[in-house]
């Protein structure tokens, strides 16, 4: 295809960036028609309404980002063969891995130069119009799969795997075809081979983790999920649930390994770490909960809900002085909380400091004369 006659879609939320790419393409004499969109949703509307030979998509955008747009393109039978050049301002591993897994034809990091853009577009268009034999087999496999001729699909994917023995995606897709015909043994072999030839193939490792989890082989599932966590944040919610399942089965060391790896990856993400913390408290893993809380309180010293939880954990462990210190800290900053005052009263009672306990009980009962827990504690005096 003549590069001058291409219909190109440029999707970027920054107007100046769209203009820069447009100017570069004009100077390179690439593209006859240039369509512009400021987010993925607008870009998708253009793709559905007009012919596009190449899409140049920014990764980070509002409304619908580049990853979501790319996934929508690949999931649409009418759009999926459009070549995509992904552009990002970051070189983060997660972005590179995700772009590779959703089958992007090219990936560039800003700032762009005309020479690099020219080389990448020429390479993409050449690949599209001069596919290798393995790619032709992959396309035939897809056609047969959609026609529900799975036997033929498997044969063509096997040929592709022979021609590209180091292509983990081909091996993975072959495994998924075996899964469709109920051949789990061959599926497992293909996925394991895919994982072995590509140490960065996070999707295959995720599939293996899920497969072993479904078989209740939690140790094998955990082994693959530990690798997944090292590579990406994408499947974190599932990894947290697997950690909880491991605690349920009393496989404590592996559960802690998973949780610790997630926490190190999300060191500033309070919501994820609190989720893990709450699981550990529910499962009575209190010493590990203390370790998590110490880290959180160090990073979020004004989060008094965390300090309160630390008090509860220490109280449960029988560490009365530590618990009292935490609750007194909360009470100093959130003096209206009756639950905290009651905790302090109980701990003073445990320390046989009846006068201090009585003082805090009186405060609770003045606010709520019918407070059942406070009245029950008073009867112990």
Regions found by a protein language model. Name each.
Residues 15-35:
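Two-component/phosphorelay signaling modules centered on CheY-like receiver
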Residues 36-45, 66-69:
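Helix N-cap/capping motif at the beta->alpha junctions
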Residues 68, 91-106:
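Alpha4 helix (beta4-alpha4-beta5 surface) of REC/receiver domains from two-component response regulators
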Residues 50-57:
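Active-site beta3 strand of CheY-like receiver
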Residues 61:
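Receiver (REC) domain active-site loop signature in two-component systems and cognate sites
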């Amino acid at each position: 295809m003549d590069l001058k006659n291409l219909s190109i879609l440029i999707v970027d939320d920054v107007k100046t960036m769209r203009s820069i790419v447009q100017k570069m393409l004009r100077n390179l004499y690439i593209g006859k028609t240039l369509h512009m969109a400021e987010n993925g949703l607008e870009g998708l509307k253009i793709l559905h309404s007009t012919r596009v030979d190449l899409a140049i998509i920014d990764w980070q955008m509002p409304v619908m980002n580049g990853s979501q747009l790319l996934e929508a393109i690949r999931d649409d039978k009418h759009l999926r063969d459009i070549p995509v050049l992904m552009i990002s301002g970051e070189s983060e591993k997660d972005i590179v891995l995700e772009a590779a897994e959703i089958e992007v034809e090219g990936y560039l990091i800003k700032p762009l130069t005309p020479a690099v853009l020219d080389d990448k577009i020429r390479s993409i268009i050449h690949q599209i119009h001069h596919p290798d034999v393995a790619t032709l087999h992959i396309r035939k496999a897809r056609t047969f799969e959609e026609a529900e001729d799975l036997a033929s699909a498997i044969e063509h994917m096997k040929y592709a795997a022979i021609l590209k023995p180091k292509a983990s995606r081909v091996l993975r897709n072959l495994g998924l075809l075996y899964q469709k015909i109920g051949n789990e043994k061959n599926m497992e072999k293909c996925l394991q081979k895919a994982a072995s030839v590509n140490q960065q193939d996070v999707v295959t490792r995720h599939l293996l983790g899920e497969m072993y989890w479904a078989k209740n082989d939690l140790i094998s599932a955990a082994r693959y999920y530990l690798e997944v966590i090292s590579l990406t944040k994408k499947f974190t919610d599932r990894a947290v649930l697997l950690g909880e399942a491991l605690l349920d089965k009393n496989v404590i060391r592996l559960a802690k390994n998973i949780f610790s790896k997630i926490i190190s990856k999300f060191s500033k993400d309070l919501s994820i770490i609190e989720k893990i913390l709450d699981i550990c408290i529910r499962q009575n893993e209190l010493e590990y909960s203390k370790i998590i809380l110490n880290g959180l309180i160090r990073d979020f010293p004004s989060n008094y809900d965390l300090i309160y939880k630390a008090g509860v954990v220490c109280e449960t462990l029988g560490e009365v002085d530590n618990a009292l210190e935490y609750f007194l800290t909360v009470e100093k900053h959130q003096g209206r909380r009756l639950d905290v005052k009651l905790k302090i009263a109980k701990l003073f009672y445990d320390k046989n400091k009846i006068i201090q306990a009585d003082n805090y009980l009186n405060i609770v009962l003045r606010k709520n004369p019918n407070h059942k827990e406070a009245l029950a504690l008073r009867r112990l005096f």
